[in-house]
């Protein structure tokens, strides 16, 4: 359904029908529930903490040990970042979350002895974070952290 047809359909509904639709969507989808809760009470820091835990869980067990048998599902981490960016409009917190993802993957790699094939992945996340930081004009806030991350990634690459 296109946006135009959605608008047309919603315009034809009365207040009770709209209320019912929103409640159904709230109950049906976790993402919708999170979005509506954030929309009603925007608290970027609490939202960021929740997503930090979820991203960390992609790479580590509950006891902060790297997941042993399976590789982390980067598609899951990417989805978390997409969902976070869709909800949070605070550029500083989004930049922090992008850097956190790269730091978490680098941290996971420091525990594991994987092939060099993981290096491009962690560098891609770092570069994406750096590009976002530059676009948002937050270099003064995050340039040192990005340099430190790149240094750590390069040290890991030499030891793999």
Question: Where is each model-derived feature located?
Answer:
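Basic helix-extension-helix modules of the SAP/HeH family
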Residues: 1-40
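Eukaryote-biased, non-catalytic alpha-solenoid scaffold regions
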Residues: 5, 34-160
């Amino acid at each position: 359904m296109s946006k135009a047809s959605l608008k047309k359909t919603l315009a034809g509904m009365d207040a009770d029908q709209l209320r019912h639709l929103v409640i159904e969507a709230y109950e049906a989808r976790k993402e919708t529930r999170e979005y509506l809760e954030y929309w009603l009470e925007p608290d970027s820091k609490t939202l960021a903490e929740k997503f930090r835990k979820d991203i960390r869980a992609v790479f580590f067990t509950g006891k902060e040990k790297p997941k042993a048998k399976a590789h982390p599902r980067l598609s899951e981490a990417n989805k978390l970042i997409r969902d976070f960016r869709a909800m949070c409009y605070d550029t500083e917190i989004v930049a922090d979350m992008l850097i956190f993802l790269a730091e978490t993957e680098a941290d996971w790699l420091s525990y594991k002895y994987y092939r060099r094939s993981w290096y491009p992945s962690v560098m891609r996340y770092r570069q994406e974070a750096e590009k976002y930081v530059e676009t948002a004009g937050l270099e003064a806030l995050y340039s040192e952290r990005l340099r430190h991350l790149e240094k750590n990634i390069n040290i890991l690459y030499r030891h793999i």
